[in-house]
Regions:
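N-terminal Rossmann-like FAD-binding beta1-loop-alpha1 element of flavoenzymes
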Residues: 24-53
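Central beta-strand plus flanking loop segment that forms part of the substrate or channel wall
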Residues: 68-71, 75-76, 80, 116-121, ...
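Flavin-dependent oxidoreductases
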Residues: 193-268
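Extreme N-terminal leader/targeting segments of oxidoreductases
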Residues: 1-28
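Flavin (FAD/FMN) cofactor-binding and adjacent substrate-gating region
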Residues: 1-10, 77-83, 103-175, 179-180, ...
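Active-site lid/adjacent beta-loop-alpha segment flanking the redox-cofactor pocket in flavoenzymes
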Residues: 243-331
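Glycine-rich FAD pyrophosphate-binding loop
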Residues: 46-66
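C-terminal catalytic lobe of FAD-dependent flavoproteins
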Residues: 160, 298-377
Length: 377
C-alpha cells in the first residue's frame, strides 16, 4: 500500500494548531479535540467558564475525523436489543436524545450534513429476521422505521439518520470556540494528569478540573478503565468518483461490521472487516493493514460492483465498552472522562460532551444518567 494514511474527508485546507509552550492556568482543561471534546468546550464557554483544550495530534485527528460519516440515532445496540439490555425507558430516551442531537448538528453545521436517512441491509436470513424484530419494536414505540426490499438488499430504512463530513464539522467547531475565547493546543500529548494539573512535555496546565474526552486509546490514557474499555483499529478506504453504482444514503451491512456511503462527488467510502481480522485489530496501532484493506477492496469490487481506483486508505482507533454504553463520569478526584462510544461517537459523543460538563460543574447527574445509568460525580 503506497497511499498515505489520510482520510477522504481531509481537504488539506486546515492550518494545524500550535503546541502548548509553557505553563498556563484555566478553569477547565479538556483533553481531546474531537467532536465530544469540542462540544464540551462549547458548553463550558456558554457557561462563561475559561477553558484550555489540548490534543496529542490535532483537531479530529483520531476517530472523530476519520470515521464513516454516519449520523445514526440510538445506542450502539439496535433498538430492540437496547430495549432488552438496558430497558425500554433508557433505550427510548437515548433514541429520542440522539434524534434531537442529529438535528442540532445539522442546524449548527448545515454545510456538513445531508439528511438522507440510512439503510441497514441484512447479510443472512437470520439477520432479515432480526431486522423484522427491530421494525416491530421501533414501530411499537412510535419510532420511524421502514421495511426496505430493493436494489441494495433487504433490511430497514431509517428516515431520521443522516450523512455528514466529520472532519469538516470538527474543524468548524474548533474555529468557533477559538473565536469565542478558548485556548486550543495541538501536538501536546499528556504525560500525566491528576486533580488540578495536566502535564505535557511542553508545559503544565493548571486547572480546577480536567475533562478527558478521548475515544480511541482511552484505556491507554486512563489505565483504570482497562477491563471496561478496549481499543480497536477501524479501517476504511475510498474510491475515485464513480457512476457505476449509486448509493443513496449511509448503508451498513452484516450487523454493522461493514458500512459505506457515496459522497456528493460520487466517490465511494467503505469501512469494515474488523472482526474478520481477529485479535490483530485490538490494537493501539493505526496503520492500515494489507489483510483488511484487501477485504475492503474485494467487497467494493465483488459486492458493490465498483471498479474505480482506490484513492485513500486509512485507519483510526476507536474504543469499545463492555456494556455498549459509553464511559461518562468521574474517574479520579477532579478528573472526569467520556469516551468508548463503540463506534457510535458522532452523535452519542456530542451528548456526552454536554452531559459531562453538567456533571463536573454542577453535579447534575440527570443528563449522564439518561445515557449510561448510575454515574460517579
Amino acid at each position: 500500500m503506497l497511499l498515505e494514511n489520510r482520510p477522504v474527508w481531509d481537504d488539506h485546507e486546515w492550518s494545524p494548531l500550535p503546541a502548548l509552550d509553557g505553563d498556563v492556568h484555566t478553569g477547565t482543561c479538556v483533553v481531546g479535540l474531537g467532536g465530544s471534546g469540542l462540544t464540551a468546550i462549547q458548553e463550558l464557554l456558554a457557561r462563561g467558564e475559561p477553558v484550555v483544550g489540548i490534543d496529542a495530534e490535532d483537531v479530529a485527528a483520531g476517530a472523530a475525523g476519520r470515521n464513516g460519516g454516519f449520523l445514526l440515532a440510538g445506542a450502539y445496540d439496535f433498538y430492540h436489543d437496547a430495549v432488552r439490555l438496558h430497558g425500554r425507558a433508557r433505550a427510548r430516551a437515548i433514541y429520542d436524545a440522539t434524534i434531537d442531537e442529529i438535528q442540532r448538528i445539522a442546524d449548527a453545521t448545515p454545510d456538513t450534513v445531508r439528511a438522507v436517512g440510512s439503510l441497514r441491509i441484512a447479510a443472512t436470513e437470520a439477520e432479515v429476521s432480526d431486522c423484522r424484530e427491530q421494525l416491530s419494536s421501533m414501530r411499537g414505540d412510535g419510532l420511524q422505521c421502514d421495511w426496505y426490499d430493493g436494489e441494495h438488499g433487504t433490511g430497514l430504512f431509517m428516515p431520521a439518520d443522516a450523512s455528514f463530513n466529520p472532519l469538516a464539522r470538527c474543524r468548524t467547531l474548533a474555529t468557533r470556540v477559538l473565536s469565542d475565547g478558548a485556548r486550543l493546543f495541538a501536538r501536546t500529548p499528556v504525560l500525566a494528569l491528576r486533580q488540578g494539573m495536566v502535564e505535557s512535555s511542553f508545559g503544565t496546565i493548571h486547572c480546577d478540573r480536567v475533562i478527558v474526552a478521548v475515544d480511541g486509546k482511552l484505556d491507554m490514557l486512563l489505565p483504570e478503565l482497562r477491563g471496561r474499555v478496549r481499543t480497536a483499529r477501524l479501517q476504511m478506504l475510498a474510491t475515485a468518483p464513480t457512476s457505476e453504482r449509486t448509493v443513496p444514503c449511509p448503508t451498513y451491512y452484516r450487523e454493522g461490521y461493514e458500512y459505506w456511503q457515496q459522497l456528493p462527488d460520487g466517490s465511494l467510502t467503505i469501512g469494515g472487516f474488523r472482526d474478520r481480522a481477529g485479535a490483530s485489530e485490538w490494537t493501539f496501532d493505526t496503520t492500515p493493514t494489507d489483510a483488511v484493506q484487501q477485504m475492503l477492496e474485494s467487497f467494493v469490487r465483488d459486492r458493490l460492483g465498483v471498479s474505480a481506483p482506490v484513492t485513500h486508505r486509512w485507519a483510526a482507533s476507536a474504543a469499545f465498552s463492555t456494556t455498549g454504553l459509553p464511559i461518562l463520569g468521574r474517574v479520579r478526584d477532579g478528573v472526569w472522562a467520556i469516551g468508548a462510544y463503540s463506534g457510535t461517537g458522532n452523535v452519542i459523543g456530542a451528548l456526552c460532551g454536554r452531559a459531562v460538563v453538567a456533571l463536573a460543574l454542577d453535579g447534575n447527574t440527570l443528563p449522564a444518567e439518561l445515557l449510561v445509568g448510575n454515574v460517579q460525580c
